[in-house]
C-alpha cells in the first residue's frame, strides 16, 4: 500500500511552525507496514489544495491530510476534500455534543457559527473522535482510495492517530507485526557491523536500525497470519541477534535494555524501582536536575523519589551535601572522588536506598583540564559506593547533559538487576 501525507497550513510554508506531524505519521505508518511514498505541504488555498488532492489520488492508495479542521474560514480541508469527492458535509452527533458541553461552561457570546464547522464530517465517513480538542477527524474510502483528515495541533493529532486511526488501519490493511529492541552503550555503525550478515540477507522478518540520541533501536518486522506466528518468528530472530558479540567481545545482550517504540532507559529504571520497592535520590551538577525531572515525569514517581539536590558550584556541594571543601578543591569537581561523595551524601541525607550523582563538563569549554563531555557518575547503596567515567565527545552541551542522564539511568538499572541477581 502506498500512502501520501499532505500537511495543510500556510504557517508551515512560511516556517512559522515545524511539521513534526509528518515524522510521527511516517513512523506510525511504518509500524503498520504502510509505505509512505510522498509528503506534501500546501497553504490554506482551495485551488492549490484541490490540485494536491487530485495528484495524491492518482498515485497513492491512502491519503492523509493534516490541519485545516478549525473554525476559521481558512480552515478548509474537509470542505475541499468533500468538494473533490462530490460529497456533502454532515454533522457528527458526538462532535456536536462535545461542542455543546464545551461552550456550556463559557459565555454565550464565545460560540460563533464558525465553531459548528468543527463538528462536520464528510458524508459516509467514519468519524475519528478528538479527545483533546473540538475538531472531529474522519476516514472515508471512495473508488478504492482511502482518505483521512486529522487536526493539525500535535496534541490533538497524536491521540487521534494512536487511539482511533491506528486501530482502524490495523483492521483494514495491516498484516505486519513488529517488535522494537532498544540498545544503549553501542553505536549504530557498530551494531550494523555486528549484524551485517542478518541485515544484508534479510527477507522476512526484516531488520531496520534507527539511531536516536544516545541509543539505537532495531525494528524487527514480519508479515504473517496472526500474532502467535509473528511472536514465534520475531522471538527466534531476536535470540539470534542477541547471541552476537560486540567488536569488543561483549555479548550484545549486555547492551540491550528493553522493548517498545515509546520505551526509555528512564522508564525501565523507574519500573524496576517500583517493582523492587526501592527509593532513589540524586545530586546533580552538570545536569542541573535533568535526572530528577525525568524521573518525576512518570506518574507515581513519589513512590520511589522524595527529593534530591542540584549542587552546581563547588561551594554548594560543600554546603548542601556536607563534602569537605578542601578535599573538593584538591580532587576537583570533575572527579571520581566528587561523584562518589555526592552520591553517598545524597543517600545518607535523604535515607534513600540508592543515591546517584552526575558531575562533569557539559562544554563547550574545558574545566579543570578536562575536555568537554567528561562526566563522572556516582552510585551509592548501603553496601557499596562506586563511580564510572564517561566521555561524551563531539556533542552539543544539550546532548552531553541528556546522554549523561542516560548513563546514570543505565547504571541504576544495572545495579537494581544485580541486587535482584538478574544480571
Curated annotation (Swiss-Prot):
Gene name of this polypeptide: cinA
Family the UniProt entry places it in: Belongs to the CinA family.
InterPro entries linked to this entry: CinA (IPR050101), CinA-like_C (IPR036653), CinA_C (IPR008136), CinA_KH (IPR041424), Competence-induced_CinA (IPR008135), MoaB/Mog-like_dom_sf (IPR036425), MoaB/Mog_dom (IPR001453)
One Pfam family this sequence matches: CinA
UniProt-listed PANTHER family: NICOTINAMIDE-NUCLEOTIDE AMIDOHYDROLASE PNCC (PTHR13939), NMN AMIDOHYDROLASE-LIKE PROTEIN YFAY (PTHR13939:SF0)
Gene3D superfamilies linked to this entry: 3.30.70.2860, CinA-like, MoaB/Mog-like domain
Database matches in HAMAP family: CinA_B (MF_00226_B)
Name of the protein described by the UniProt record: Putative competence-damage inducible protein
SUPFAM superfamilies: CinA-like (SSF142433), Molybdenum cofactor biosynthesis proteins (SSF53218)
